[in-house]
């Protein structure tokens, strides 16, 4: 029989027994009977801290792994986790190369769609890698079609992780400026939100993915990978859909960019030896579409926080990849799809020279200073 998940009421019972000398002498069933009427008389605000504790316990339980011992019998969990992280990164890179190679061999590289995802969060739990989601955005992107569609929503988890209100206020004030729960904007039913998001993302899977039940692969920046992974787990856990928690794989968009660029350069006969992950990472850090108007949600446009809007982020990633790769394939840049609406490009495609942009010498695109 599957073990029951911790819930808010049982978190209250445990706290009551720990703080009440009389309660420590009761069995669990007796304590539950004693606490029932007390719980019924509590307000939603009073119950909030116990809901938060139960939530954190559920998410952390899913993340926990059995500790192993080294030869002297000492826990080597850190080394095990380090090795697992290295293996996961290598597997991710192999998968990205396989995806791009498959599209290239089938002559569909220009049409191959990729999913970009970003999350904003309210706060991070102190005792685990748990981020509480505040905003989600995703978009579909291909080299030929640019950004074909996007999905964006704000999220209201109902309450802040217990004891984290001050940290959440500081984080919001210095980044996305979203109001905190319980006054947060957006979707409150996180289970439905996760199901709707998974459905939207899964629409990009091809027939082979559907046939073999392959996970959905999404891309984000290296800095946001732990945030995106944790926020998806949070939504899946809240919606009681743990069995689908592994349906979404989060990959490095910078490594995708590198793989695409090197592949395209090879296709057009341009040397690609100078390209490496440090080069592609630097372009994403520059983020020269950061101040483009008209690509953020209405709220972040109004409060002047477009840089931190997740919708703006995923669109900017598509624009950056388009800017650095489409010229090599003589793909015309379309406003809203490959570039922001107000940007006008005037470059001429010359296969032998267009890739010089990656060395910082391509200056006929309407931008300067990079």
UniProtKB/Swiss-Prot annotation:
Signal peptide from the UniProt entry: none
DNA-binding residue intervals: 2-68
Highest taxon in the source lineage: Eukaryota
Family matches, as Pfam families: Maelstrom
GO biological process, one term: negative regulation of DNA-templated transcription
Cross-referenced InterPro entries: HMG_box_dom_sf, Maelstrom, Protein_maelstrom
Keyword Magnesium carried by entry: no
Keywords for the protein's UniProt record, in alphabetical order: Cytoplasm, Developmental protein, Differentiation, DNA-binding, Meiosis, Nucleus, Oogenesis, Repressor, RNA-mediated gene silencing, Transcription, Transcription regulation
A cellular component term, taken from the record's GO annotations: cytoplasm
Sample GO molecular function, one term: transcription cis-regulatory region binding
Localization in the cell: Cytoplasm; Nucleus
Coiled-coil positions: none
Keyword hit for Transcription regulation: yes
Role of this protein: Involved both in the piRNA and miRNA metabolic processes. As a component of the meiotic nuage, plays a central role during oogenesis by repressing transposable elements and preventing their mobilization, which is essential for the germline integrity. Repression of transposable elements is mediated via the piRNA metabolic process, which mediates the repression of transposable elements during meiosis by forming complexes composed of piRNAs and Piwi proteins and governs the repression of transposons.
Family the entry assigns: Belongs to the maelstrom family.
Annotated protein name in UniProt: Protein maelstrom 2
UniProt organism field: Drosophila pseudoobscura pseudoobscura (Fruit fly)
């Amino acid at each position: 029989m599957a073990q029951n998940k911790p819930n808010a009421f049982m978190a209250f019972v445990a706290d009551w027994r720990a703080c009440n000398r009389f309660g420590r002498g009761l069995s669990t069933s007796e304590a539950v009977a004693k606490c029932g009427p007390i719980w019924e008389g509590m307000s939603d605000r009073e119950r909030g801290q116990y809901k938060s504790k139960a939530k954190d316990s559920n998410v952390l339980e899913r993340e926990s792994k059995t500790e192993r011992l080294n030869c002297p019998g000492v826990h080597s969990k850190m080394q095990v986790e380090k090795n697992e992280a290295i293996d996961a990164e290598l597997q991710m890179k192999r998968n990205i190369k396989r995806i791009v190679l498959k599209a290239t061999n089938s002559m569909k590289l220009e049409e191959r769609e990729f999913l970009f995802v970003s999350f904003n969060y309210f706060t991070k739990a102190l005792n685990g890698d748990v981020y509480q989601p505040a905003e989600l955005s995703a978009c579909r992107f291909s080299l030929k079609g640019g950004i074909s569609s996007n999905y964006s929503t704000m999220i209201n988890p109902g309450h802040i992780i217990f004891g984290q209100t001050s940290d959440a206020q500081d984080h919001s004030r210095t980044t996305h400026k979203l109001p905190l729960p319980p006054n947060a904007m957006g979707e409150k039913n996180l289970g439905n939100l996760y199901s709707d998001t998974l459905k939207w993302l899964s629409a990009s899977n091809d027939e082979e993915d559907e046939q073999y039940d392959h996970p959905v692969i999404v891309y984000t920046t290296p800095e946001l990978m732990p945030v995106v992974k944790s926020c998806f787990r949070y939504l899946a856990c809240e919606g009681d859909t743990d069995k689908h928690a592994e349906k979404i794989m989060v990959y490095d968009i910078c490594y995708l960019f590198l793989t695409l660029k090197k592949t395209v350069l090879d296709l057009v006969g341009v040397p690609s030896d100078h390209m490496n992950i440090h080069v592609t990472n630097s372009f994403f850090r520059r983020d020269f579409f950061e101040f483009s108007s008209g690509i953020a949600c209405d709220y972040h446009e109004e409060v002047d926080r477009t840089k931190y809007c997740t919708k703006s982020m995923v669109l900017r990633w598509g624009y950056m990849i388009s800017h650095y790769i489409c010229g090599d394939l003589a793909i015309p840049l379309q406003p809203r799809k490959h570039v922001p609406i107000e940007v006008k490009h005037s470059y001429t495609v010359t296969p032998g020279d267009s890739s010089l942009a990656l060395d910082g010498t391509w200056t006929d695109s309407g931008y300067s200073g990079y």
